[in-house]
Regions:
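Intrinsically disordered, low-complexity segments enriched in Ser/Pro/Gly/Ala and basic residues
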Residues: 1, 20, 56, 77, ...
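Terminal (often C-terminal
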Residues: 1-46, 62, 69-70, 99-122
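Residue-level recognition of well-ordered beta-strand positions that form the cores
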Residues: 36-40, 51-53, 79, 92-94, ...
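Short, surface-exposed beta-strand/strand-loop-strand elements in extracellular ectodomains
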Residues: 45-58
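Short, surface-exposed tryptophan/glycine-enriched loops
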Residues: 71-96
């Protein structure tokens, strides 16, 4: 089953649109946003899928084959239209094959990141 990625720390959120308690990005300004999720997985072989979900349904995804040495990132990006009130996105990860994986690999270079960037109004 898919697991929600818990981006639980913020570096920058000028409009208060990301909620670190439910891990959702809910823009308060209607428009098109570039959504980027980079999820770093631990060092085991197999395939992972990183998914952007909009309002509870899969919107975009990226599958990544990982090797057994070092951790690797899987990046998914998509342009998403938001209504400025109730539309939201979340990021999920799904292990397609291989042995159990963890997020990150315990060093400072294994950071997972999320961003939602306003591009233009509707």
């Amino acid at each position: 089953s898919s697991t929600k990625v818990q981006f639980d720390a913020q570096h920058w959120d000028t409009d208060g649109c990301y909620d670190t308690s439910n891990y959702r990005f809910t823009p308060n300004l209607a428009g098109y946003y570039l959504i980027v999720a980079n999820v770093h997985v631990g060092s085991t072989s197999g395939t992972v899928e990183v998914n952007i979900y909009k309002n509870g349904s899969r919107w975009a995804n990226c599958a990544r084959n990982t090797s057994g040495s070092g951790g690797q990132g899987a990046i998914v990006t998509s342009m998403v239209a938001f209504n400025g009130t109730s539309d939201y996105v979340e990021v999920y990860i799904y292990q397609v094959s291989g042995s159990s994986k963890s997020l990150g690999n315990g060093n400072a270079y294994s950071i997972s990141e999320f961003s939602g960037n306003f591009v233009r109004g509707l």
